[in-house]
Amino acid sequence: MAKRVQVVLTKNVNKLGKSGDLVEVAPGYARNYLLPQGIANIATPGILRQVEQRREKERQRLLAERQEAEARKTALQTIGRFVIRKQVGEGEAIFGTVTTQEVADVIKENTSQEIDRRGITLPEISKTGFYKAQVKLHPEVTAEIEIQVAPL
């Protein structure tokens, strides 16, 4: 059986791993391709320590981002209802539709939180009334808010 060499990747490599991963490869692959191209470093105890420190920092950063998103979710749900005023025609039908940008602007106006409009999911809104919207604040955190569409 051939001997394998442990290397730490410095760049993402298809079918091998992503930057910072510890992988075992054939010695020739490491010596002839990965090391000369600067794609990997031989896994020494010092480099393994550095990789572990980077992973810990990244884990802490992701945890802080998630906690901040949870706090933003709580703030949005505390307010409860956001009012959007639209011009109304006959039978409570509004002119145009309520867009995600309008919802993001109302949220910013009421909470001073910048929300990306692409993270907002709205139902089809064509009349005045109350609607539920989903606001994705983080890949794992989604807040549900209530939108009231009212006449001008």
UniProtKB/Swiss-Prot annotation:
<comment type="function">
    <text>Binds to the 23S rRNA.</text>
</comment>
<dbReference type="InterPro" id="IPR020070">
    <property type="entry name" value="Ribosomal_bL9_N"/>
</dbReference>
<comment type="similarity">
    <text>Belongs to the bacterial ribosomal protein bL9 family.</text>
</comment>
<keyword id="KW-0687">Ribonucleoprotein</keyword>
<dbReference type="InterPro" id="IPR036791">
    <property type="entry name" value="Ribosomal_bL9_C_sf"/>
</dbReference>
<dbReference type="Pfam" id="PF01281">
    <property type="entry name" value="Ribosomal_L9_N"/>
</dbReference>
<protein>
    <recommendedName>
        <fullName>Large ribosomal subunit protein bL9</fullName>
    </recommendedName>
</protein>
<dbReference type="GO" id="GO:1990904">
    <property type="term" value="C:ribonucleoprotein complex"/>
</dbReference>
<keyword id="KW-0694">RNA-binding</keyword>
<dbReference type="GO" id="GO:0005840">
    <property type="term" value="C:ribosome"/>
</dbReference>
<dbReference type="InterPro" id="IPR020069">
    <property type="entry name" value="Ribosomal_bL9_C"/>
</dbReference>
<dbReference type="GO" id="GO:0003735">
    <property type="term" value="F:structural constituent of ribosome"/>
</dbReference>
<keyword id="KW-0689">Ribosomal protein</keyword>
<keyword id="KW-0699">rRNA-binding</keyword>
<dbReference type="GO" id="GO:0006412">
    <property type="term" value="P:translation"/>
</dbReference>
<dbReference type="Pfam" id="PF03948">
    <property type="entry name" value="Ribosomal_L9_C"/>
</dbReference>
<dbReference type="InterPro" id="IPR009027">
    <property type="entry name" value="Ribosomal_bL9/RNase_H1_N"/>
</dbReference>
<dbReference type="InterPro" id="IPR000244">
    <property type="entry name" value="Ribosomal_bL9"/>
</dbReference>
<dbReference type="InterPro" id="IPR036935">
    <property type="entry name" value="Ribosomal_bL9_N_sf"/>
</dbReference>
<dbReference type="GO" id="GO:0019843">
    <property type="term" value="F:rRNA binding"/>
</dbReference>
<dbReference type="InterPro" id="IPR020594">
    <property type="entry name" value="Ribosomal_bL9_bac/chp"/>
</dbReference>
